Curated annotation (Swiss-Prot):
Family the entry assigns: Belongs to the UPF0180 family.
Species this protein is from: Bacillus cytotoxicus (strain DSM 22905 / CIP 110041 / 391-98 / NVH 391-98)
Database matches in InterPro entries: UPF0180 (IPR005370)
UniProt protein name: UPF0180 protein Bcer98_1118
Length: 79
């Protein structure tokens, strides 16, 4: 299965993805995202100026406003 990076505050999402058989990595720093097929972030630390370096070649899913099930569905459709 896919390697999914998930922000550490999203424990319910981490558990749900693990139950679906994905390898879940807790995102603590930018380097954690480099080997991930997909990353799930809270969106709270969005870059206000719109300038950012790409740390991952995989999809990035912003969890803000989504349920755990919706996030899992998005992950499944992107990996």
């Amino acid at each position: 299965m896919a390697k999914i990076g998930v922000e550490s505050s999203l424990t319910d999402v981490q558990q749900a993805l693990q139950q679906k058989g994905h390898e879940v990595i807790s995102l603590q720093s930018e380097s954690d995202a480099k080997e991930c097929d997909c990353c799930v972030i809270t969106g709270q630390d969005s870059n206000v100026m719109g300038i950012s370096d790409v740390s991952t070649k995989g999809s990035v899913i912003k969890a803000s406003g989504l349920t755990t099930d919706e996030i899992c569905q998005q992950v499944e459709s992107r990996v």
